[in-house]
């Protein structure tokens, strides 16, 4: 089961890298950023598709998108000098609270136990 969480982590990391390289490509010369973006976003969806085999889709997607937005915003401020207003901070805080609620509200599905065949004599 841990492998699926690792795959989700890889999906998040490649999504962040792909989205940041999209911004980098738009402010720099050449096509390297666009190629990196294409590869990373493609890998992100591949990793996510494997992760949802054992992780609930709602949880996986919320974590993928939410953590991605959180780190993309943080790195955009650090790398590209984008602004971080009080309203953005409030939105990110709400996002994190939503992710926590979705994750904590998800129950693990139990597998049905096998019935024992009690034949009548």
Curated annotation (Swiss-Prot):
* A molecular function (GO) term: choline transmembrane transporter activity
What task does this protein carry out? Answer: Catalyzes the excretion of spermidine.
Tell me which Pfam families the record gives: Multi_Drug_Res
Please give the name of this protein: Spermidine export protein MdtJ
Q: Name one GO biological process term.
A: glycine betaine transport
SUPFAM superfamilies registered for this protein in UniProt: Multidrug resistance efflux transporter EmrE (SSF103481)
Q: PANTHER family from the xrefs?
A: SMR FAMILY PROTON-DEPENDENT DRUG EFFLUX TRANSPORTER SUGE (PTHR30561), SPERMIDINE EXPORT PROTEIN MDTJ (PTHR30561:SF2)
Q: Which family does it belong to?
A: Belongs to the drug/metabolite transporter (DMT) superfamily. Small multidrug resistance (SMR) (TC 2.A.7.1) family. MdtJ subfamily.
> What is the membrane topology listed in the Swiss-Prot or TrEMBL record?
Multi-pass membrane protein
The superkingdom of the source organism is: Bacteria
What does the UniProt entry say about where the protein is found? Cell inner membrane
Give a yes or no for keyword Transmembrane helix in this entry.
Answer: yes
Q: Which InterPro entries match?
A: Small_drug/metabolite_transptr, Small_multidrug_res, Spermidine_export_MdtJ
Q: How does it assemble?
A: Forms a complex with MdtI.
Q: Where do the TM regions start and end?
A: 1-21, 32-52, 55-75, 82-102
Gene Ontology CC terms: plasma membrane
Listed A to Z, the keywords are: Cell inner membrane, Cell membrane, Membrane, Transmembrane, Transmembrane helix, Transport
């Amino acid at each position: 089961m841990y492998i699926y969480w690792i795959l989700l982590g890889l999906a998040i990391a490649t999504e962040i890298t792909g989205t940041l390289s999209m911004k980098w490509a738009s402010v720099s010369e050449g096509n390297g950023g666009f190629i990196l973006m294409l590869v990373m976003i493609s890998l992100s969806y591949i990793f996510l598709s494997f992760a949802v085999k054992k992780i609930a889709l709602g949880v996986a997607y919320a974590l993928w998108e939410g953590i991605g937005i959180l780190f993309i915003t943080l790195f955009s401020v650090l790398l590209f000098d984008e602004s971080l207003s009080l309203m953005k901070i409030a939105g990110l805080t709400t996002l994190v609270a939503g992710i926590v609620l979705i994750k904590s509200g998800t129950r693990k599905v139990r597998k049905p136990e096998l019935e024992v065949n009690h034949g009548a004599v």
